[in-house]
Amino acid sequence: MLITDTLSPQAFEEALRAKGAFYHIHHPYHIAMHNGEATREQIQGWVANRFYYQTTIPLKDAAIMANCPDAQTRRKWVQRILDHDGSHGEDGGIEAWLRLGEAVGLSRDDLLSERHVLPGVRFAVDAYLNFARRACWQEAACSSLTELFAPQIHQSRLDSWPQHYPWIKEEGYFYFRSRLSQANRDVEHGLALAKTYCDSAEKQNRMLEILQFKLDILWSMLDAMTMAYALQRPPYHTVTDKAAWHTTRLV
């Protein structure tokens, strides 16, 4: 949609929420996982590749804070970093994701080494981080508004995975449970920022485009996993059966 006249805050929120039609919960890869149709390799591949996204989130949030001159906003935003990195002796989301990896049969080194991260996933996640570093802090902050749709996807995993994949250990589900409340809290802050900052049709159109950019990132990650784990066409599959792609953060 193209906004020609500035929307009211409520109408703008409705436009943002309408973007949920493009959330990756509707991607065939995620639908297969939800319906119990994914193989062990596909579940493991998803967990290993999403870990790269998880470890990039605190870097993204630190970049937003570095560009934000408002102390009150920084005090609220820093909680996102603590949620993932942990604080006061408590483990955060990254540690919880490592336990998810172990619960699906991967070692911690499988995830920490990043050797399973597909180039398409790495490029998509790096694009998100680079945007957060270069955009104005308000736009970078509001790119996180895919959180509007996150509680549904976390709940769907909690509802469907235990019955479809009994081989996944129970302790692996802690991350999804913890994010149910954290995501709702983060949404309130992010929405308030978006509705305050986007006070013109131009800004509202741009913010919708930024939210679509973030949705594109999440969808593209699953496209890369589909090629590798569903269609059995990982990078360079026509010339080698080995993982020949780069496996480290180069910048």
Curated annotation (Swiss-Prot):
Q: Any keyword Oxidoreductase? A: yes
Protein's GO biological process:
pyrroloquinoline quinone biosynthetic process; sulfur compound metabolic process
**CDD domains per the UniProt record, alphabetical:** TenA_PqqC
The record's section on InterPro entries has:
Haem_Oase-like_multi-hlx, PqqC, PqqC-like, Thiaminase-2/PQQC
Q: Name one GO molecular function term.
A: pyrroloquinoline-quinone synthase activity
Question: Which residues does UniProt call coiled coil?
Answer: none
Oxidoreductase listed as a keyword: yes
**Family matches, as Gene3D superfamilies:** Heme oxygenase-like (1.20.910.10)
Pathway as given in its UniProt record: Cofactor biosynthesis; pyrroloquinoline quinone biosynthesis
Q: Which Pfam families match?
A: TENA_THI-4
Q: Which reaction does it catalyse?
A: 6-(2-amino-2-carboxyethyl)-7,8-dioxo-1,2,3,4,7,8-hexahydroquinoline-2,4-dicarboxylate + 3 O2 = pyrroloquinoline quinone + 2 H2O2 + 2 H2O + H(+)
Q: What does this protein do?
A: Ring cyclization and eight-electron oxidation of 3a-(2-amino-2-carboxyethyl)-4,5-dioxo-4,5,6,7,8,9-hexahydroquinoline-7,9-dicarboxylic-acid to PQQ.
Q: Which family does it belong to?
A: Belongs to the PqqC family.
The protein in question is named: Pyrroloquinoline-quinone synthase
Origin organism is Klebsiella pneumoniae (strain 342)
Organism taxonomic ancestry: Bacteria, Pseudomonadati, Pseudomonadota, Gammaproteobacteria, Enterobacterales
